[in-house]
Amino acid sequence: LSDALQKFEDFMAPDSSCLAPLGAEPLEKGIKKFFNPDFVAVVQRPASAYSGFPFIIEMGIAYGGDIKSGGPHVYRYANRIPLLYDEGSDVVLKVVNDTDWGRYKIKGEPPFIIVSHICSTRIPYKTAGKENVADRQEIERELRLALQFLSRKLSSFMSKRGQAEMA
């Protein structure tokens, strides 16, 4: 029975109706209000689960405008609470640092920001201080997919902008 349960892969994901994500529209409005960017894109990934706990990843990317160069600047949130300390060992920063920005035609240190929000019934913090999110495989995968989607949108914007400047 134990072997059969471990091999079974058709378990349904937990219900995500108990989660309260920010939403794509308020996230986009907030980014526009505080950073006045030339480009902004947001995505809300479909609900997923780790260890039986549902979670939703929301992410936004913004470029130009009032954003200082030296990017990417990362803003992390978990259940609507900003994670201000110990960002170096967070799963979000790991995903951002592992991204090959050259693939998306982003060279140097351009002015852009990444805002990530993890909404879950149980955030897997590394420490009792709730300062950073542990790198769980399922959460890392959803963060990576969200960042890849947004990076493609930013790359498309930069290509169109470059063509317009050449003309």
How would you label these PLM feature ranges?
Residues A62-A167:
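Charged regulatory segments coupled to nucleotide-binding catalytic modules in large multidomain enzymes
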Residues L1-G108:
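GHKL/Bergerat-fold ATPase module in large chromosome/replication-associated machines
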